Design a protein with these regions (language model features):
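Alpha/beta-hydrolase active-site loop signature
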Residues: 87, 116-123, 183, 276
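A short, Lys/Arg-enriched amphipathic alpha-helix followed by its capping loop at the start of a domain
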Residues: 102-109
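Short beta-strand-to-loop junctions in surface cap/lid or active-site-entrance loops
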Residues: 65-78, 228-233
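Gly/Ala-rich beta-loop-alpha elbow adjacent to hydrolase catalytic centers
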Residues: 150, 154, 158
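Alpha/beta hydrolase fold serine-hydrolase catalytic domain that processes acyl esters and thioesters
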Residues: 159-315
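Short beta-strand element of the alpha/beta-hydrolase
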Residues: 77-86
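Catalytic nucleophile-loop/oxyanion-hole region of alpha/beta-hydrolase
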Residues: 92-93, 99, 112-145, 283-289
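A glycine/proline-hinged amphipathic helix-loop "lid/cap" segment
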Residues: 1-71, 219, 305-315
Length: 315
């Protein structure tokens, strides 16, 4: 297969974003110690951090023994539970603080960011257990509907929680919005091959994170680890997957959509052209990334209201 020409696929704004990102978090960051990876990742996130919108109130709280951060802009019956990205190795409440604050301000919903424990200090299923424990406690605290959301590793956790909650927490999850999630798709298929060496994330990077997360050989057939390894995709909440064209994980959104539709559910996959993994941070530098963030917030807002966001489909 011919290698993609990223000089053509990516516009000047995305290249400028990637150069800025690489100043803090270099392409070979996985070769650093875990401590150093976290340090440079945190510096990168701080460099891109935007001022919180007016009116958003934040409070660090604990749910189910897991540290969380709550964002509110007024009373709301809907709670968005957000799981941050970072390969299960880096990231936390501060890395995605501005993203959560903006979702809160623009949707009007309560947003709770979950600071699940990271690998290698806690290996699988530790991160999932934290994600699900926080979900259960949040669902017990707030009586209204819940929208699950997350990016990259956090998209994996959001989907894993949705799968595990079936038959256990009934009628509460109004939808899930997964942003360039890693769901455990076929590594010999689609974007895994076509964009194996994409800027910002490569399949080699992914293999590193999988080894660290699992503490060795990744488990097989466990949807808590890889939601696409489930054998039953019925009964899942309405699902919107938004991925980046130039990302080895993009095909996971398509595969997951197809599995849910085949099981009779509602699902939508949008592949954003000319974007790369991690583009949420580019939303103030790139018109394409900003437009995608608009779609992400639109999907969350619609699902929370009980609507299907059909208007999000790209023209």
């Amino acid at each position: 297969m011919n290698q993609p020409d990223y000089g053509v696929l990516l516009d000047d704004e995305i290249w400028a974003y990637m150069r800025r990102s690489d100043e803090f978090y270099p392409p070979d960051a996985v070769g650093l110690s875990i401590e150093d990876q976290r340090a440079v990742y945190n510096k990168m996130c701080a460099a891109f951090h935007q001022t919180d919108p007016d009116g958003v109130q934040t409070l660090d709280v604990t749910f189910g023994g897991v540290q969380c951060r709550r964002y509110e802009v007024g009373a709301s019956d809907i709670t968005v539970i957000y799981y941050h990205g970072g390969g299960f190795v880096v990231g936390g409440l501060d890395s995605h603080d501005d993203v959560c604050a903006e979702i809160c301000a623009r949707s009007g919903y309560r947003v709770i960011s979950v600071d699940y424990r990271l690998a290698p200090e806690v290996i699988f299923p530790g991160c999932f257990n934290d994600a699900y424990d926080a979900f259960q406690a949040i669902a017990a605290e707030y009586a209204g509907g819940i929208v699950l959301a997350g990016d990259s590793a956090g998209g994996n956790l959001a989907a894993a929680v949705a799968h595990h909650a079936r038959g256990r927490v009934v009628g509460r999850i109004k939808g899930q919005v997964l942003i360039y999630p890693g769901l455990g798709g076929d590594p010999e298929h689609g974007s895994y091959v076509r964009h194996a060496n994409a800027p910002q994330l490569t399949v080699a990077d992914m293999a590193f994170y999988q080894r660290v997360r699992s503490g060795g050989e990744p488990p097989k057939g466990d949807p808590r680890y890889a939601p696409l390894h489930d054998t039953d995709f019925s009964g899942l909440p309405p699902s919107v997957m938004i991925t980046a064209e130039c990302d080895p994980l993009s095909s996971d959104g398509e595969t997951y959509r197809d599995a849910i539709l085949a099981a009779g559910g509602q699902a939508m996959w949008i592949e954003e052209p000319g974007l790369v993994h991690g583009y949420l941070r580019a939303r103030v530098m790139s018109q394409k990334a900003a437009a995608s963030f608009d779609r992400i917030v639109g999907a969350i807002s619609a699902l929370g209201a009980g609507d299907w966001p059909a208007e999000l489909v790209l023209a």
